[in-house]
């Protein structure tokens, strides 16, 4: 048996506090002098506005957030949250960090399920406290837990064995989860992902068919590459393990 917990941070990039980030860069990574001043300059002077219809609010100075999608933004977020691993290692859980996607993983035999579930619960609570210290917000509503195993082992489990309890909040196990863009089920068959990919590709092909008379062949090839081929190429190495399921595509 294995269990995967996918943590969700609310507005993750938008809640990075500039002062705390500069302190982390200095104390944890030893960045000082002109390099630290460069980062300070990069973060300083940013503002935000809100536009509704044709009305735009006055600009408000930002003391939090790093630009999501920028080259430096992801690196700064990783630096800001890197020591979250110290809170996880206490509970002997495996983990993967992908920018603002944090995942906890554990393998176990059936007799260890309760012990491992309690480790997940305590670890998530510790991460919640760590997030508060960094002015980040863990979102339990979007945090998920997924159990993996054979069909027979999954059938033996009771709901009480599978839920995460975070104080008064209960996280029920998911039947499928989206992990880095791929839908997984409890038996790791990726059937849900194949079905979703096939449906999405057919949808786009039907839409593109309507454009055939309006665009030349080169343009159509680029559109098919962007909207269809790119989806088939994603995780293509993983697809090869499920050849019998690929007839759907």
Where is each model-derived feature located?
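Basic, alpha-helical interaction scaffolds
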Residues: 168-240
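Conserved pre-catalytic core of RNA-dependent polymerases
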Residues: 1-67, 106, 224
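Short, conserved non-catalytic motifs in the polymerase core
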Residues: 5-6, 50-76, 105-111, 164, ...
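Conserved pre-motif C helix in the palm subdomain of viral-like polymerases
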Residues: 10-13, 62-90, 195, 220
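Mobile genetic element proteins and their domesticated derivatives, centered on retroelements
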Residues: 8, 25, 39, 50, ...
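Active-site palm subdomain of RNA-directed nucleic acid polymerases
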Residues: 2, 74-105, 109-111
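Short, conserved micro-motifs composed of acidic
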Residues: 111, 122, 136-176
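Catalytic palm subdomain of template-directed nucleic-acid polymerases
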Residues: 9-29, 103-129, 241-244
């Amino acid at each position: 048996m294995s269990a995967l917990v996918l943590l969700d941070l609310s507005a993750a990039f938008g809640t990075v506090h500039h002062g705390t980030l500069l302190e982390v860069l200095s104390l944890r990574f030893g960045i000082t002098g002109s390099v630290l001043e460069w980062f300070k300059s990069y973060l300083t002077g940013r503002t935000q506005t809100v536009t509704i219809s044709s009305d735009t609010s006055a600009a408000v100075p930002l003391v939090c957030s790093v630009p999501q999608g920028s080259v430096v933004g992801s690196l700064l977020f990783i630096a800001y949250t890197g020591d979250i691993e110290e809170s996880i290692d206490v509970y002997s859980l495996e983990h993967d960090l992908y920018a603002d996607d944090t995942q906890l993983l554990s393998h176990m035999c059936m007799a260890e399920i309760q012990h491992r579930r309690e480790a997940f619960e305590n670890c998530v609570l510790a991460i919640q406290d760590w997030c508060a210290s960094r002015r980040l917000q863990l979102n339990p509503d979007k945090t998920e837990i997924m159990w993996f195993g054979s069909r027979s082992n999954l059938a033996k489990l009771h709901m009480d064995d599978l839920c995460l309890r975070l104080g008064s909040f209960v996280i029920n196990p998911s039947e499928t989860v989206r992990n880095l863009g791929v839908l997984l089920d409890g038996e790791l068959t990726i059937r849900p992902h194949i079905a979703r990919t096939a449906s999405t590709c057919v949808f786009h092909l039907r839409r593109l068919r309507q454009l055939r008379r309006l665009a030349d062949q080169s343009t159509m090839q680029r559109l098919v590459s962007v909207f269809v081929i790119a989806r088939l190429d994603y995780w293509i190495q993983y697809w090869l393990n499920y050849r019998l399921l690929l007839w759907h595509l």
